[in-house]
Amino acid sequence: MISLLQMKFHALLLLLSKVWTCICFMFNRQVRAFIQYQPVKYELFPLSPVSRHRLSLVQRKTLVLDLDETLIHSHHNAMPRNTVKPGTPHDFTVKVTIDRNPVRFFVHKRPHVDYFLDVVSQWYDLVVFTASMEIYGAAVADKLDNGRNILRRRYYRQHCTPDYGSYTKDLSAICSDLNRIFIIDNSPGAYRCFPNNAIPIKSWFSDPMDTALLSLLPMLDALRFTNDVRSVLSRNLHLHRLW
């Protein structure tokens, strides 16, 4: 009799635990959705005639974007979730086959990434450049693009240069005119050959209150008017060591 009661009690605890986990999951998803689409954004104003004329005098520039820990963070089903708090909902999944083994990635989008891409795609030609394998990077880029055709140009691990256990990214392979190309990347090593063509950003894993992408918009809005991005970005060299 006592054993039966214990079994029922444990079953009840298990059920309550699952219900609580489900409630926490749904609550966290709603919080993330609210933060992602909250109306506090970078306000865009129509350009004045003077600004339009100034912009017409310079060439349209190329903005290169890293993926992992810059725009998104992911973990796969064979890797412990030590970078993401338990119960944090993912935004989408990516299923790929690596070395004949099926791998499922759970992908978390950095807060405001959709709005960020919408805005900067109006100012720049966007390029994805990731040190990840193409089969994974392409699937993630497809999800971020979401049918908008703003992330059509993509470079992957095979386009990187091996460098002491890591990878560097050759921006000149994308655009030989270095005065109109720059990269946003959380890893300074990735652009160490092009420090004057880079904007550092702090690595992101799961902080739902992160506003790094929004914070970059005023600078990116102004940078499109310059003749040479290096004239501005070369002043940021001290920032690359912070990340």
Curated annotation (Swiss-Prot):
Q: Supply the alphabetized keyword list.
A: Hydrolase, Membrane, Protein phosphatase, Transmembrane, Transmembrane helix
Transmembrane segments in this chain: where?
A: 11-27
Q: Per the record, GO CC terms?
A: cytoplasm; endoplasmic reticulum membrane; Nem1-Spo7 phosphatase complex; nuclear envelope; nuclear membrane
Q: Where is the FCP1 homology domain?
A: 56-223
The reaction(s) annotated as catalysed by this protein in its Swiss-Prot or TrEMBL entry are: O-phospho-L-seryl-[protein] + H2O = L-seryl-[protein] + phosphate; O-phospho-L-threonyl-[protein] + H2O = L-threonyl-[protein] + phosphate
Q: GO biological process annotations for this chain's record?
A: nuclear envelope organization; positive regulation of triglyceride biosynthetic process
Query: Domain of life, per the record?
Result: Eukaryota
EC numbers listed for it are 3.1.3.16
What is the protein name for this chain?
Answer: CTD nuclear envelope phosphatase 1 homolog
Q: Which organism is it from?
A: Drosophila pseudoobscura pseudoobscura (Fruit fly)
What does UniProt list as this organism's lineage?
Eukaryota, Metazoa, Ecdysozoa, Arthropoda, Hexapoda
